[in-house]
């Protein structure tokens, strides 16, 4: 017999609204990822209701798609919890920038902001970064919206414009970010980013360069693969050189000397040229960050028309999983002392390798259903699985897709892997959760079960 509490949670609490009349499915670049997310969708909120987040109220509308599961993570701020592995990575990066880059007064060049609240406006998250109104990254299926005007930030880049407008020329931003995504050991709806920005005046950039006084930052030219239309080639190449030098020093500090690095050209809406850095770690090339020369239009709009700059962004979980051999992103949210005590280090730069907790067995259950006639999107299903199954769910794989030759209806079959990080799950316990997932999918997504 299915657990009634789970069914109730699935039906009443998957979306913050108590009553959901139907699924409003829309179709789907994320900051510092050059790979666009899959096209996905969201479910309507209840107009007239209000969300309370971090002491502020936000009216809901047809764009509201927050889940209780995600809302419970707001304010946890793992990157600020002392001795948490994400805190260790943040502190190592901060220490490196503080020690390596100083002004004449011997104070740090870069200021650090790691307590900025995650609720931002859609203008901050998209428009300030020159992301077009019709860009797929704005879709409800990829983001968590409080309403049409507010959302949980999808990247720390959402704070770039405000900090530049405040007159800052060099800063790091660290924070939790939120995205609707697939379910596996490397993806979670909440993760943590570190953003870096540096602006240069003409004097700062060309200081020490032969005949630097005759060089200019800007020109009226044309855009090419190597530069923006407003930048001189000399300025761009110096900014690019500084950016790559700064980031190579950073990853060498984190991973050790002798690290092999390569740069891959890519695209971001707010930088050009843009690059991804890959490192050769244990014989495998790993993407660790995205970066580029900031779009001058963004810099100008923030009031720094006489400067040129670079920006980069990296994921803390990505680095921590590699540096500390942490195999599953869910572990970062664990409160198990066996996990946390492994990172109680006297020196933040001390090498540590995560010792796995006992590997409890996985339980596999499949779920098959016919899709509704139109507008089915996978991220709605993933949100249901995450909310009902919570961190019992290790991953979800689409293992079969079938189109009926006569009716042309499409069927999906997903394999859900259940595994608790701290104990063995019983078949009965998993069965209850799985049935609740099935019922919620039927009620909220309009699918027809093949259970």
UniProtKB/Swiss-Prot annotation:
- EC number assigned by the record: 6.1.1.20
Q: Name one Pfam family in it.
A: FDX-ACB
Coarse class of the protein's main subcellular location? mitochondrion
Give the record's GO CC terms: mitochondrial matrix; mitochondrion
Statement: the UniProt record of this protein carries the keyword Acetylation: yes
The molecular function terms of the Gene Ontology recorded here are: ATP binding; phenylalanine-tRNA ligase activity; tRNA binding
- What is the reaction catalyzed? tRNA(Phe) + L-phenylalanine + ATP = L-phenylalanyl-tRNA(Phe) + AMP + diphosphate + H(+)
* Biological process according to GO: phenylalanyl-tRNA aminoacylation; tRNA processing
Provide the protein's localization: Mitochondrion matrix; Mitochondrion
Tell me, in a sentence or two, what this protein's role is.
Answer: Is responsible for the charging of tRNA(Phe) with phenylalanine in mitochondrial translation. To a lesser extent, also catalyzes direct attachment of m-Tyr (an oxidized version of Phe) to tRNA(Phe), thereby opening the way for delivery of the misacylated tRNA to the ribosome and incorporation of ROS-damaged amino acid into proteins.
> Protein name, please?
Phenylalanine--tRNA ligase, mitochondrial
Instruction: Name its species.
Output: Mus musculus (Mouse)
């Amino acid at each position: 017999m299915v657990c009634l509490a789970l069914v109730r949670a699935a039906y009443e609490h998957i979306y913050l609204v108590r009553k959901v009349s139907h699924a409003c499915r829309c179709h789907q670049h994320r900051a510092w990822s050059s790979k666009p997310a899959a096209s996905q969708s969201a479910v309507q909120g209840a107009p007239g209701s209000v969300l309370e987040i971090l002491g502020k109220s936000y009216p809901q509308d047809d764009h509201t798609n927050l889940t209780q599961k995600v809302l419970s993570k707001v304010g946890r701020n793992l990157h600020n919890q002392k001795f948490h592995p994400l805190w260790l990575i943040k502190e190592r990066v901060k220490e490196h920038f503080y020690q390596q880059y100083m002004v004449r007064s011997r104070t740090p060049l870069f200021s650090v902001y790691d307590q900025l609240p995650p609720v931002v406006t859609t203008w901050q998250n998209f428009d300030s970064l020159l992301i077009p109104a019709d860009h797929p990254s704005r879709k409800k299926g990829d983001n968590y919206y409080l309403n049409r005007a507010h959302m949980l930030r999808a990247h720390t880049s959402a704070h770039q414009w405000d900090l530049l407008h405040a007159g800052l020329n060099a800063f790091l931003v660290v924070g939790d970010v939120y995205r609707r995504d697939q379910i596996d050991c490397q993806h979670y709806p909440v993760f943590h980013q570190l953003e870096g920005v540096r602006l240069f005046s003409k004097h700062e950039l060309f200081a020490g360069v032969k005949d630097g006084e005759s060089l200019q930052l800007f020109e009226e030219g044309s855009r090419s693969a190597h530069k923006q239309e407003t930048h001189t080639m000399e300025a761009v190449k110096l900014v690019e050189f500084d950016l790559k030098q700064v980031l190579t020093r950073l990853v060498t500090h984190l991973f050790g000397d002798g690290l092999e690095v390569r740069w891959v050209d890519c695209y971001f809406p707010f930088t050009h040229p843009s690059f991804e850095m890959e490192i050769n770690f244990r014989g495998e090339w790993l993407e660790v960050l995205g970066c580029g020369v900031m779009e001058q239009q963004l810099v100008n709009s923030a009031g720094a028309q006489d400067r040129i700059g670079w920006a980069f962004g990296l994921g803390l979980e990505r680095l921590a999983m590699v540096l500390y051999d942490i195999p599953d992103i869910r572990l970062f949210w664990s409160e198990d002392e066996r996990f946390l005590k492994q990172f109680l280090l006297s020196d933040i730069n001390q090498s540590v390798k995560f010792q796995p907790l006992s590997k409890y067995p996985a339980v596999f259950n499949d779920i098959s259903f016919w899709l509704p006639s139109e507008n089915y999107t996978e991220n709605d299903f993933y949100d249901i699985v995450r909310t009902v199954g919570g961190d019992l769910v290790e991953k979800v794989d689409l293992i079969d897709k079938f189109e009926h030759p006569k009716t042309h209806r499409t069927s999906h079959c997903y394999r859900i892997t259940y595994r608790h990080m701290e104990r063995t799950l019983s078949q009965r316990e998993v069965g209850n959760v799985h049935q609740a997932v099935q019922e919620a999918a039927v009620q909220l997504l309009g699918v027809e079960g093949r259970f």
